[in-house]
Amino acid sequence: MPLTRRRALAAAAATALFTTLAACGGSGGDTTAAVASGTTAVTVGALSNGAAKEVTINVPVVDSIRAQLPPQIRDAGVLNVGLGLLPAGSPPLGFVGTDDKTLTGSEPDLARLVGGVLGLEVQLNNATWENLFVGIDSGRTDVGFSNITDTEQRKLKYDFATYRQDNLAFETLATSNWAFTGDYQALADRKVSVSRGTNQEKILLEWRSKLQAQGKDFAVEYYPDNNAVQLALESGKIDIYLGPNPGVAYQVAQSADSPSPKRSAGTFSGAGESLQGLIAATTKKDSGLVKPVADAINYLIQNGQYQQWLGAWNLGNEAVKTSEVNPPGLPITNT
């Protein structure tokens, strides 16, 4: 189906869905409607089962930013947003809400706020991590909001509009005395889990190569989702999980009163030891969308909605002062 035709159908379907939800008194879904002018009310932290403090944030359409949109997106009135949360989600970044259908989390909520500034209906498309990028490559997805790290390798295919610091954390059982203080030598002889295709995997495998050159090693284990990772930690199949700091902080808080409490055993920049990592909205390279997305994020930063969003999800310590387009990211060779 031609892209323009598909967008038109998506816009019509999204409008119909929003009208139905409003008539029933519903609160959200995988489509968030915005108006081409005026103000949109976005409920941040909805259906989060206590992971966030629910707050309604008003977002006006900014005509000067909307005018920068690629014509096919502006005319269709829909922003197709990609999320890489399948199969089990990743609280607090993104997961299925308490109604068992609505996608909630810090990442979809920011996408909804950006859509409000741009005067676009936000259509959330959830996929596996790998298929998130397939969607962007194919044009089915306009932009990814899914804790995507700015890396130089990814810049070969994508443009980035940054919106949060990228910090990684090492999760262990609370009973473990292992700690990471910046020296990868501490990983020797440990069993470590990480997600495939991520910047943290790249960093971890480079550390492993350096240790192997010294005659040392550690095991790298992969699991299909975060639930399996937590079970592996609790059963002793792994010693350490390396993942996004917000997710580790969430697991530590959730497990505090459980039989197997967890703790954060240290953090590391998602861009390596010489650069502060950054999380970014991700568009197909040279699509023309990255600048209006960055400008929309900067509008939210300058007018306080960004701070409300971070506060609702307890991510204030990962705030950035400005959204940048394609700043330096994790080097292709992190040496």
Regions found by a protein language model. Give the residues of each.
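C-terminal motif of bacterial Sec signal peptides marking the signal peptidase cleavage site
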Residues: T19-A23
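Bacterial signal peptide processing site
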Residues: G25-G28
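Extracytoplasmic small-molecule ligand-binding "clamshell" domains
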Residues: V35-G144
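Extended ligand-binding regions for polar small-molecule ligands
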Residues: G38-D63, A111, G116, S176, ...
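Bilobed "Venus flytrap"/periplasmic-binding protein-like clamshell domains
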Residues: A88, K101-V117, I148-D150, N167-D225, ...
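Acidic, polar ligand-binding/catalytic clefts
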Residues: E121-A186
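A ligand-binding cleft/hinge motif common to bilobed small-molecule-binding domains
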Residues: I148-K155, L204-E206, K210, D239-L275, ...
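Periplasmic-binding protein-like
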Residues: Q165-T172, A256-D295, G316-T335
